[in-house]
């Protein structure tokens, strides 16, 4: 009888613990500065760095810091946190810019891979979290 009760206790404890624990979804992981540092920044540096990192800020857009990225460039804001469909950056890397001035990005280079675009969309949808310090 004690073994049965002990077994029931173990099962009950496992079920109770399981109700508090849940897997972290990909979307939740994307809302952290670490996701930006590990996944997004390398994509941006590889594909956008020549024109929008370091001392180059074509179109007035610098992707170096959180503040400058969220500020946008001469044409306005490029990222709407939580809304990839209305984020100009997402539209341009998908080559879906406005018909009168499409600005496909990166210019004169192959289109960013679908997998990398999906990472950027996921990051923007999750709120576009970035570290405050670009060195992080």
Where are these regions (language model features)?
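Aromatic- and Gly/Pro-enriched helix-to-coil junctions and flexible linker segments
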Residues: 4-5, 17-136
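Sec-dependent signal peptide hydrophobic core
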Residues: 5-12
């Amino acid at each position: 009888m004690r073994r049965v009760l002990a077994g029931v206790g173990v099962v009950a404890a496992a079920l109770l613990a399981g109700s508090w624990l849940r897997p972290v979804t990909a979307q939740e992981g994307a809302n952290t500065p670490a996701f930006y540092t590990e996944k997004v920044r390398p994509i941006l540096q590889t594909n956008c760095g020549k024109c929008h990192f370091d001392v180059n800020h074509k179109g007035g857009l610098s992707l170096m810091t959180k503040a400058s990225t969220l500020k946008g460039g001469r044409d306005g804001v490029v990222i709407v946190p939580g809304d990839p469909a209305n984020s100009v950056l997402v539209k341009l890397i998908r080559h879906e810019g406005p018909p009168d001035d499409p600005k496909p990005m990166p210019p004169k280079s192959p289109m960013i891979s679908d997998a990398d675009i999906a990472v950027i969309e996921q990051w923007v949808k999750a709120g576009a979290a970035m570290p405050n310090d670009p060195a992080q």
